[in-house]
């Protein structure tokens, strides 16, 4: 296992799901962590599990990534230059495109696209990362092609992919885009319905999905190997192959499948 003692990793959305699992995976390698999320109590639980895994120094930051004033104030407080910036915070959606309110479309774009972009720019302006920093951003299999009842989510995750690929080319730096499929996390609980209310239940796809820790192991392994993309999940990942090589089949049957 790679030794990351002396390295600093900032992870957003670190209080649960893939973010918490990524934090533990970096902790096992001895990295120092800056864990950012809205829920202080959950962050403290993740901190304790990371400490037990062998993490170096751990800093907790209770903040909403869409509160740009708070993000701008936070950025200069980061000590030194980050070795890894992991942009993982996100929200999903569960509604038909034509029934989804514009406020929901904007909220999903705000959380899944504009927030990570703003944090990235704020940290750069504060001198907290440079071209030697490795950035990882959590997109989704839905960021590779469309899925039903995920129109805003797909749009945001596609935008995230485009932005960070462009940044990689401009800065000549390492960027890894993470494309998880169905992972057993609580993301569907907070997913937005057409009217903006919370979905409030676990989808079968999530409930039966890959364990978050197993997902994180593959993601961190890919990050440390310098991969540009890490695609991780179960049998649903065959959709990537079908979309690329048999698009006619994909568009005929994908609408009938349960979305990710």
Residue ranges of predicted features:
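Conserved glycine-rich cofactor-binding loop
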Residues: 15-16
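Residue(s) in the substrate-gating loop at a strand-loop-helix junction
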Residues: 140
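Active-site helix of classical SDR
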Residues: 120, 156
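Conserved glycine-rich Rossmann-like NAD(P)H-binding loop of the short-chain dehydrogenase/reductase
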Residues: 31-45
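Substrate-binding pocket helix/loop in short-chain dehydrogenase/reductase
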Residues: 96-107
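Rossmann-fold cofactor-recognition segment
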Residues: 53-68
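SDR active-site lid
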Residues: 172-234
